């Protein structure tokens, strides 16, 4: 007896050692970062997607982020004993084998959800060797991962037709909503769709898709998973899915945020509805713009600097208008947009008050002879009128008194740097656009007029901190805002 126990123990240890060695030699091919990304609006709406090397689109989710009745439909139809079996369900395999032999054809399969995940991670042939490989990978899954992790892999890797993988990608592409909002009928359809994603693709084969969905609903009814009312309403609901739609909003922001180390879900502060309206608006204006001219729109909530809309060009695909250039982040001439900052700094420095007289008259500064945008000059004007009318000569006069170098330095300290040629010093021309700046930094500077003189950087993502810097005093910011408000 002792000898038999000893041999049995030795055999068990040898078997475990063999399995451990095989696990080390042939590790489980868990998914690695494949560069598939989805850029999201603040509410989770997909704005843009970056496919992996094979063109596949995924939207990662967890079991808690999908409708509970979808999980009920999935597990009831695919694997009722998912949480009880060790990856392989012997009873299901035996039943499927008997049914297939009795029917002389493949009537049903005995694959568990874990076995399907194993096949998704490591595709195999339908030969005996292929089935053994699938069983081995299934056992590895159960050893290394929890049931929740295996279910999560299925939710994100199951095929849903074409280049769609995962229930969330399918829900957004076909229904335009998150998987947490699936109806009971939609949940039943999505539970069966991965079994034959090409044959059951609802936008191409709605009748086949509905028949498969109804089969799932009948099984749910047989096991009393859903109430008769829920089953009845789901059976009455037609399969009406829109043609596949891919997210196509904020492409230049998506390109900006998509880096090598970016997460699979790139969250932004954008308002998807506002972004869509403004993109439609800008496209409508394209024909009115001069040739080779683009445009940009940046909408920011000044209290927290969250970006609500980001349009870096008219159309990223319009090569004639250099649509690939992000004009929000590109260096461009600021024109007259720096004038309010200069007047505010001059107020703080005691050089002027709002009614101080400035001279709008022709004047030469060495080789520099500025003029107004509109022909003619106004003579003596108040500082308020000069700023409200965006007159050039008074601004140059004021910059000469304040100092170009000092002005550029204070702008830089507040997060609104100016770009100048190498070794060049700030001069009087910078107040009329003779330097480079970025739209996003100008917007950060203008924030000071609404927030007591504090400039701040724009925030593109929810977890970005609010970084404020003093540009003007609260008093001068209030005065400048009042002047610009008319």
Where are the model-predicted features located?
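Short, well-structured active-site flanking segments
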Residues: 83-93, 165-168, 228-231, 321, ...
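Flexible glycine/proline-enriched surface loops and loop-helix/loop-strand junctions
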Residues: 53-57, 133-138, 196-202, 259-263, ...
